[in-house]
Amino acid sequence: MRNRLRELRAEREWSQAFLAEKLEVSRQSVNAIETGKYDPSLPLAFKIARLFGKAIDQVFDDGE
């Protein structure tokens, strides 16, 4: 699943470690989500969207 996580994080000048702390996940998890190696659970996806003040479909794109 494609996502805008890296772009949104960069706009705020947040490190992966800072975002990971906010989301209560590892930095490696943030990296894996950003690179598309890991799709977040639905609760985590909603948490990410809320953190950035976006609708979930503004952060994640399933390619359809």
Regions found by a protein language model. Give the residues of each.
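DNA major-groove recognition helix of helix-turn-helix/homeodomain DNA-binding modules
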Residues: 43-58
